[in-house]
Amino acid sequence: MRNNIKSDIWSFHNKFRFDKKIILLLIRVSIKFNTKLVNYSRRPLFLDLLSVLTKKILFSLAVKSFKDTFITLKIRNCSSLFLKHNSLLVFNSIILKLLKNFYDVLGFSSYEEKKFLILFQNESLYKLCAFEFRDLTEIVFTFIIFGEIHDKDYSGKVCSNELNFRCLENFLIRVCDCVVYFSIKYNYNSSILYALRGHSWIKSFKDKQRLFIYLLLSSYFHSIIDTTQKLNNSIFRGWIVRGTYIDSISFEQFSLTSLKKLPKISLLVFLLINVIDTVIPQFNLFILFLRKAITFIFSDLIIKTNLL
């Protein structure tokens, strides 16, 4: 069992080893621009492409990592995900490893926060994580989205006995709506677990390993609801716009040279799409349909042309 888990962890690590910068770039750019451009109809097409492509890349990696399957999940507007049973344990141990590495940076200072962290700790599996996941850390924390859940909307009673997928779906929507401000680059005294602390629903989930899997595999891109909410400045440092506000991630590395691995024909198509979207804005319905169709087709094309 020990060797199998180590093997799975190492395999998962290798999945992210190649093209990590491209994946991280897509995640960063998608999150940044989706937060700034509230009006979806006026958002440039390439941002839609980045969002869809990022989601497909993440889920492609997830599916490749868990080939032997017997659990099928359906999460809001996404294809079925297949997870290997013992990989649930692996993911849980990886999350714990990452949280432990960033214990000081994330500002776990109070007794309650430490107590909450212990709730998700599986010591026997944690000890098996002998590898360093420094390359993974920024990627993982970029799309693990923790949010503030209001008990009146999503009470623990709904999910008390078993994992109710309908309740889980609503929960994920809310998580994507109210994103907790967290920081990796800067040493702000904030914790990604802060907003989860004390809510009754979290105590109702018996299988906390699966809960973290869902959180990990459900990125911000699954649901964006127009919500603007001012939260405690000392924790969240700003406004939540269209579901997320993350200014702690550095976007300085973004440049067109980062996309060198894309085939030239793909870049030409990419530019052509943006020209069409700009020149013919009056055909709103047609452009909307074309936007959706080309975005999905083009993202598949990029994946098939060995970007991953």
UniProtKB/Swiss-Prot annotation:
Cellular component aspect of the GO annotation: chloroplast
InterPro entries: Uncharacterised_Ycf55_algae
Keyword set includes Plastid: yes
UniProt key word Plastid: yes
Keywords: Chloroplast, Plastid
Main localization, broad class: plastid
Localization: Plastid, Chloroplast
Superkingdom assignment: Eukaryota
Family recorded in the similarity comment: Belongs to the ycf55 family.
UniProt name for this protein: Uncharacterized protein ycf55
The organism of origin for this protein: Cyanidium caldarium
Gene: ycf55
